[in-house]
Amino acid sequence: QMTSMKSEYVTHNFTPIFDQNSQILMLGTMPSPKSRETGFYYGHPRNRFWKVVSDVCGEPLPESKEDKIQFALRNRIAIWDVLAGCEIAGADDSSIRNPIPNDMNVILERVNIKAIFATGTKAAQLYRRHCQPKTGIEVICLPSTSPANCRISYEQLYEAYSQICKYL
């Protein structure tokens, strides 16, 4: 475990991806350094999010940022993160301090979202603590697709993420 990572205050700089047709909202914790570098959600080359979600939806893997946005909207998937800002060391979710939540009503007041999913335990925990009291909507916790979560096989990820299909 790398303990040398310095904690820094990070703010979220991606707009939420959604439109009038979005049916589910998929929430991460916060963009990782790699995602901030690539300028889009789940941007680490070894993050399995885009692969598993496109496989579950029966579509080819979207490559560019524009492809990913179109893919999400076409499949009625809204994408955002639980946090607007926090102190974090690198991409280590367990190091998060002083979290500032995003206002989920930005999406929920405009769109009829049927289910909210968290892409990882920490995102679910932060949502339950900081967002659920305001939204009144439970979150369904999915396993993290981050490269740090290599204990879980692709088959297990696929099975877990298949749950989203019930709502699309």
Locate predicted features.
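Short, glycine/serine-rich, charged loops/turns that create anion-binding
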Residues: P31-K34, A84, A123, S146
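C-terminal capping/extension of enzyme domains
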Residues: M2-Q23, P45, D92-N105, R128-L168
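Alpha-helix N-cap/helix-start and coil->helix boundary motif
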Residues: N47, A123-A124
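Short, hydrophobic/glycine-enriched beta-strand segments
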Residues: Q23-T29
